[in-house]
Amino acid sequence: MYDYLVVGAGLYGAVFAREAKKRGKSILVIDKRHHIAGNVYTEKKEGIHIHKYGAHIFHTNNKEVWDYVNQFAQFNHYINSPVANYKGELYPLPFNMYTFQKMWGVTLPEEAKEILDKQREGAGVKEPCNLEEQAIFLVGKDIYEKLIQGYTEKQWGRACKDLPAFIIKRIPVRFTYDNNYFDARYQGIPVGGYTQMVEKMLEGIEVKLGVDYLANKEIWDKQAKKVVYTGQIDAYFHYCFGTLEYREVSFETEVLDIPDFQRNAVVNYTDRDTLWTRIIEHKWFQFGKDDKGNDLDKTVISREYSTNWQKGNEPYYPINDEKNNTLYEKYKALSQKEDKVIFGGRLGEYQYYDMDKVIERALKKVEEEEIIENQRRTSGL
């Protein structure tokens, strides 16, 4: 019997498995997919590491987490600087002086602030109650209508008036000339891709792929003293309170026999009429070079589409509105009665976590498990 059965070979599962093994525990990792690394999985085409489930740029202010991931991969110095395309007009992101200069022709922060203040006053928003009001409060009506509204409504499948304000609070606004999207001390992408990094995390650990845990739960539960579950928490409990809502993302990926398509890794299409939310050109995550530093003659692009999640498909983003969060709390209360199961990760905790937060939580959980075990040993249980 194993000490832990880890369900899911994504970042949470891989980090937990690695750290538990270091503490002398026996581990079995299983995953329903036929590959490791979860949604950060990368695969190689034409010398290019393809982000199969969408763009993943690692960023963190946590030095402990940064040092941790650097044990398993060398990170390049990629800086996330996406571009917004509104009906052929290109705007730098995040919202900064370059954006304001293109939008209004201003060059000084005071000029941009004056325009924003007028647009806020005109909208009459003092305490934003939804995403639309929050966006106008942050960046004014012009930027909201051109660069936020259409993109966000495609991404979430709802009118901005019907989305919670907190979603837009993640978007940075700067009055400096700075196209670095993430205000993080550490940033980059693993040289050789994320899959290679997760492979190193799982070295020496037994892994079985193509295994559906929930389809044979009783059998798998007998294999270990404790289960670490990183799948959908509502599915674990057979949707007994109802189904939590997610957004689903699909991709159309093409290999193009040209050296350059858009000259940028990520371009967001912010008008409502363009069906895709963004186009990723993967070669620019590695600066247009292969692993040996050679120029790449071809390129690979992925058009990204957001839709409502359907059961049986891969869920991507939890929809953390009031209705779904209330439903999640019911499942969370049930999960706390499962003494031999740990629920973790985006799906297990129904939270939109960045990669560094997933790793942080997995490291913390292993430490908590060690403390519990030491307490039991001390008390003679």
For every predicted segment, state its role.
Residues 23, 214-334:
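Mid-domain catalytic core of redox enzymes
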Residues 314-381:
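C-terminal catalytic lobe of FAD-dependent flavoproteins
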Residues 2-29, 366:
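N-terminal Rossmann-like FAD-binding beta1-loop-alpha1 element of flavoenzymes
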Residues 46-121:
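Dinucleotide-binding Rossmann-like beta1-alpha1 core, especially the glycine-rich loop
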Residues 21-46:
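Glycine-rich FAD pyrophosphate-binding loop
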Residues 11-12, 34-35, 98, 153, ...:
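Short, solvent-exposed loop/turn segments at secondary-structure junctions
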Residues 87-92, 97-225, 230, 237:
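Active-site/ligand-binding neighborhood in enzyme catalytic cores
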Residues 2, 24, 205, 223-225, ...:
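Short, well-ordered alpha-helix to beta-strand connector turns
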